[in-house]
């Protein structure tokens, strides 16, 4: 083996080397990471919580009180501390995915549980029995919390929850309450970065698709830079259209009716796009094309939703259907479409009401069976588009930093309000946890030392959560 080859071999072996720690040494190093990260996150807790400024790779810093945002921004140079931090980040992220808020409290509880558990292990207690005492008694606390919940449904209750969740901002409280009033408690409310000084609430009735026209040549109103048609046909497919021959047969039938056509496809390009634009400019065909929204299964589901809402048929090669064989009966219809460079709004779809109701019920069943926040948001969005409308809160501010800070605040308040509508509210400030943990005291009887310790760890963490809000 040459000297160079030996050096390469040594470098590879060194790169794969692992630093091993065991027992209390490993736990103590992890605890440092848990403590440091939790200190930063918990500083944002409650109405008196502090803002945290986060340096970004580019642009101005981000100012936020959102626990999971702070947690995810932290990375330590020490890899052991970083491992400990990752434990807490995972908890915060999971809490955010499931509940949408409460990440700071989750971080606080995680720190206390880990800290107290290390004390138990250092005392020589059996970790499996301690864990058993903790996990079994958590169920009892959850049941007690469920008993003390109060349902939230009226506009005033929604306003109060939103205001409290937004650090007492009645302006944000009214904004969120108005949004729920506009689209209903199951409707979709999205928060976007605005371009004005003040916050704005826009309600879109009908079905809004987050895709604009493929080419600006499809505009028919140069002032508003939009394309608007009344009583159009709608072609719905997940097929990429790159040849005019694919759509020539159906276009011939559409031209004879004199009605406009909205094409929703995976993409429209090549001579197909060029021919559509030429015919539109010449006035021989009223047409506009947009790309299908979403990706993967979500794209297919959304296209099927559009088909149901407009009384059309979803044309897909997976279903054995080809564009060349599309008939006029396969096309959807609606009263009006408005297409901008960013989105498309379908008003007055001609879908069968019973079919739309059945589709909505199916989505509701899927909602009850998912725990993923991403899937929940997508299902809610689909449901709202089928049943009513979408409310968009555009966040305003004097500059990018202020807009970002306000957006985080509104996001948290919206998520907390939505959770309150779904599952109710309990006494705040850690009081509900403290009261619920009282149910654990009788359960400590006739238990071994390890299980009793596990129960006490849960109780102590709840007491700390309550005191931290003071």
From Swiss-Prot:
UniProt-recorded Gene Ontology molecular function terms: ATP binding; ATP-dependent protein folding chaperone
Keyword entries, A-Z: ATP-binding, Chaperone, Hydrogenosome, Nucleotide-binding
Entry keyword annotation includes Glycosyltransferase: no
Subcellular localization: Hydrogenosome
Free-text function comment from the UniProt entry: Implicated in hydrogenosomal protein import and macromolecular assembly. May facilitate the correct folding of imported proteins. May also prevent misfolding and promote the refolding and proper assembly of unfolded polypeptides generated under stress conditions in the hydrogenosome (Potential).
Family: Belongs to the chaperonin (HSP60) family.
Protein's UniProt name: Hydrogenosomal chaperonin HSP60
